[in-house]
């Protein structure tokens, strides 16, 4: 089964993503901060990570760097309300 890690501090957004994905046959796990997300990533096998950028304890940019170090082949989809060009470019790093 395809497993997806959702890292989102807004419970409503996390629940919306979780429900939509599970209704389409995906297994999901949710973390509400970057540190919890990294721990889940390190202790489980995921095929995709969906993460907010503005997160407590460890922001999405740093989290993504840690995920890339551990497994550069796992796709990371960044969700955010940030819209500046600099923010978008930071997401590619």
Which positions does each model-derived feature cover?
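N-terminal/domain-start alpha-helical segments
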Residues: 1-93
């Amino acid at each position: 089964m395809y497993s997806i890690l959702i890292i989102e501090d807004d419970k409503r957004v996390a629940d919306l993503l979780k429900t939509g994905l599970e209704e389409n046959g995906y297994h999901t796990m949710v973390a509400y901060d970057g540190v919890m997300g990294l721990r889940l990533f390190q202790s489980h096998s995921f095929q995709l990570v969906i993460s907010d950028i503005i997160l407590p304890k460890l922001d999405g940019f740093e989290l993504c760097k840690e995920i890339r170090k551990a497994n550069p082949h796992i796709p990371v989809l960044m969700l955010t309300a940030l819209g500046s060009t600099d923010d978008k470019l930071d997401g590619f790093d």
